[in-house]
Amino acid sequence: MVMSDFYKQFAQAVLIAGGIIASAPSVWADSFTINSGETVTATQGGDGGMVDGDTGLIESGGFLNVTGSKGIAFSDGLSTGVSIINNGRITSLNDAIEGPGGDNTGAIVTVINNGVIHTTEDSGNADAVNFTGSNGPTLILINNGTIETFGISQGAEAVVAGGTGHIITNNGTIITRGITADAITTSCANCTITNNGTIITRGRGAHGIFYLNPGTQETITITNTGSILVEAQTSNGILLNNEADTIVNNSGLIRVLDSTEEAIRGGSGADTLNLLSGSQIIGIIDLNNGTDIVNISGANNSSTLTLTDVENINLLNSNGLLVGDVVTMVDPTGQSISSAVLSTTTSAVHNVVNQRLAHNQALKPIQVATSELTSGMMFQERAPQIWGSALGAVRERDLEGIALGYDHNYVGFTGGYEASFYKARIGLLGGFVRSEVKTTGDKFGRIRSVDTDTDSFFVGAYSQYFLGGINLTTTLMAGYEDHKNDRAVVDNLNGLETAQADFSSLFISPSLTLSAPYRAGEQVELRPSMTFTYSGARYNDYIESGTTRSNLFINNRNVHALIGQLQLAAAYSFFEDGEFEFRAGATARYTDDNDIDINLAGTGAAFRIPNVSDDSVYGGYLGVNLRVAIVDRMNLIADVEHGRAGGGEEHLAAMLKLEGVF
């Protein structure tokens, strides 16, 4: 009886356990996690492959190393989807991640790679991510790490997908090495492919992005903000072998090393190519049949592009010339910022004068014990002074509109002689400034668009008049500048080239300063001031050399800049011949430059590009000034200033001055 009850209870337990096992969701069996420090050598997904609802996770430091087969497999006929996250490393002989067969309509497979995916076999069956088939699931692939295939003689592709509605995004690196081993191949309908990272193919006939679909009803969007580098023969950067309507947005680099091949090759559909800010293309551009459109806009390096089989070409920023199927685009940055660069350096010299005169006190009457005034008793003149000042600054400004961001650095020397004259101090000055302007490179460290070195030589005169409680300081300087300019050109047929030119300019720059210093104590003086500085220049015409078909003749032009400055300084005299000054101020810069008239050298084709810099810039600054006597009749002055302005403009300036009294 006891045994009978035992067997009954045992049988019930077996039935219950069997029911639990039979009704358990498949995720229990086919989902997987590979922990950090763990190495797994079996194909993931179980015997039947991953099914709807399954998840896979490889932690950082985890390894899936399958030497005899595929890495991760799926069950055929998905209806909802599967998700996989790789933070570690997947290495497999054949396909690293192989999608399901059968009808997978409506299913979505999400693959996020933050680690490394490798395949090792020299075979066309060793794709890294393989989701072929017209009825495959929708693939959402986000690569933030590295996907690489090592097959040499066979076409082991990094990503290959059929189906519909795929969203493929590369933020990391995709590399293939083999013959016909495309980085991304798809025949899907209505797909989106985005490359924000780096794509490299090294095998013959291996394309960066290859879209193959004979259908006419589909659309596809390809966006490249990163780099697509194709290193072997008969290989294209982007190949559209289809009848679909395709939109290609490029703000990155597409480069093919085979000069007979296309960087972008269109299909027979209506293709639209948008060349946006940062676009650089080296290789043939041929959009083939269909009613194709190329739109060129944004801030870019100068470029010369031959656009083959393009029915509509639109230059949206008016900074280029279209002759036949050749577009000459000119970066207007170098010409547009010339007034801002000039006014920055001239203002630095004016400020040297203003800083030194801020220390001068109004001439005092001689105190004598008599009621009569005779000649020579009105004012006591000071001894003449000779001074010299080294100055320098680093300045930068961000991109604005189609004007690229740039760095402006300068160093120089100015000196002068100063003496008293009646109720004033007057002086002569001269000096030179060597400056460098470079447009900033992009995040890939690619070429700078403009690199200009300038040597400026100037002379001038200044005076300070004491008008009761107000001091009036005027300065007038004029000079000559010698410029050496390099302009980078991206020629899609001839590669990266440099257009070089030497030219000169003349400038004049007066300034006027009103100041009203007054004592706030025995050792403290407040020094409010207001300064207006004008700078005007005429740049002579010049012709470039050094490129195959992109040299320009630049006509002469005038530039103008006006800077207004309000400042409040507080000076503390810590001993008789020593002083520390702190100042704060606000500035406004207004520029008025002509547009740039250009001729394409050797052709006579003339066009005009706009001046695109911001003509009204407002900012502020802080500065400190230290003045000490180092020996008898000789003072040393050190000055540092930091400022910011609209448009992401920032500067740091320094000055070191020595002055001696006769």
Model regions and ranges:
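Transmembrane beta-barrel domains of outer membrane proteins
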Residues: N87, T225, G278, D286, ...
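Extracellular/surface-exposed low-complexity segments
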Residues: M3-F6, W28-G37, T41, N274-S277, ...
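Membrane-embedded beta-strands of outer-membrane beta-barrel proteins
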Residues: I84, V111, L141, I168, ...
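Beta-strand-rich solenoid/repeat architectures in extracellular/passenger domains
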Residues: F32-Q44, T55-K70, S83-I97, I108-A126, ...
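Outer membrane beta-barrel translocator domains of Type V secretion systems
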Residues: N65, T344-E522, L526, I637-F662
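Gram-negative bacterial Sec-dependent N-terminal signal peptides
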Residues: M1-A29
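Solvent-exposed, glycine/polar-rich loop segments of beta-barrel outer-membrane systems
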Residues: E400-H408, T440-V450, D482-S504, R538-H560, ...
